[in-house]
């Protein structure tokens, strides 16, 4: 297992999938309400496809309230403009076991549009931009 307790490398995940110890991978991101959301995929599909290509999801997931109802006021997602697709690209530095869900692993994802441009409004994208700004100033 990875250097930190519960953390996994991609190779370790592949081995756990091959032995049947992991059967599900949750590919997740934080929505505008601070909740973890995303997709649950079979571990074999994750290893064979999602790890390299990512997984698509609807941008609706960024723009709903706590009851999963659509909310007015989001320029990127509405009934007027439509609900488009985003790509969740796994960040393997976040790959970890989920001990409270046996047989499962979790990986956080960076969001981009299907044309490859980052989803600037995604909380993780905002955080990464702020971390870059701090690094430019020598603060991290």
Positions of the model-derived regions?
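ATP/Mg2+-dependent ligation/transfer catalytic cores
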Residues: 1-140
